[in-house]
Amino acid sequence: MKKIFIFAAAGLLLVAGCKGGKKAAGDSVTEPEAAASVAAGPKVMAREVPERMDDFVFENDLIAGRFYGKALEGDPTSPGLDVWVKLPGKLVADDWYAHAVSDPEYYHHDHGGKDCYKVSVSLGGGASAPLVGGKLSYPATNWREAAVLSQSDDAVTFVLKYPAWDAGGVSVRLEKTVTVTAGSYFCKVEDRYYGDFQELEIAAGFWIHEWKEGCAMGTDDDFIALWEPASDQSVEPEDGMIGIALVMPAEHMTEILDDGEKRHHICIAKVRSGEPLTYWFGSCWSKGDIKDFQQWTNTVKSQAGAAGIAAASSN
């Protein structure tokens, strides 16, 4: 098994790798110590937020994030994941949105966490898009349909639907199914692309923001990982560091994609129409339980291992 890890304080190293298709989907690995501190009651949530520009927000006791809806199109139109940082232990999204009704900047300030991650037009903290001629072909709109498919105190699954758009002369549409599990830094994703194609090349990954002192990046057979400043905002003097990762057990290639404006670390795989592309996106905050890139890498490796075990049992 080939393993490559990159730790860098300055400069950006291009990493390329290839792995075999011996694994597929599985369950998320949990963090028992963090989960044990959570009070009784729901430990997950996911819902549409019509009161805030049609966001679709989700969270568990460790992580939170959102995908942009119709009302925000153009500012930006992006399939990317907007990562929220937060301290472990409780759900915060509903409280933050409630305060934002009277103070729109409320969740941009630290209240045990905050929204300080910049998405722009990108894959953000973990999403996918067709790869056409070496460039990402983003959906022409934000999500237009959403539904919660199942929900309990410990897990919630939802689907977001993106209408058809032109991807290099091929009309494709996307159905994104996400499962959020209590006690995990990762969410499982099944992206299904539909269209009149035999195979479609898909890139799943995350945006690499400005490379600064303290940044680090690594890759292995089953994952790509990043450690970078949590924010490029100036609202707070110090927002700490954020860990981002994407786990993909299926056969894929990895590379750094630079279009002159943004750099993404991506996993590239081919899918047939309606075939699920399964991966996990994950995040952490240095002000929480995971303090450095080594801890984050260990957590990511555990998730990759869990995905592989589940894949082996399903094949």
Tell me what each language-model feature is.
Residues K19-G21:
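Bacterial signal peptide processing site
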Residues G26-S137:
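Solvent-exposed N-terminal domain segments of exported/luminal and surface proteins
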Residues I4-L13:
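Sec-dependent N-terminal signal peptides
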Residues E105-T181:
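Extended, loop-rich substrate-binding clefts of extracytoplasmic carbohydrate-active enzymes
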Residues I244-N315:
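Beta-strand-rich recognition/accessory modules
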Residues L174, Y185-G218:
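Acidic (Asp/Glu-rich), glycine- and aromatic
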Residues Y194, E210-R263:
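Accessory, usually C-terminal, subdomains that scaffold auxiliary metal cofactors
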Residues V15-G17:
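C-terminal motif of bacterial Sec signal peptides marking the signal peptidase cleavage site
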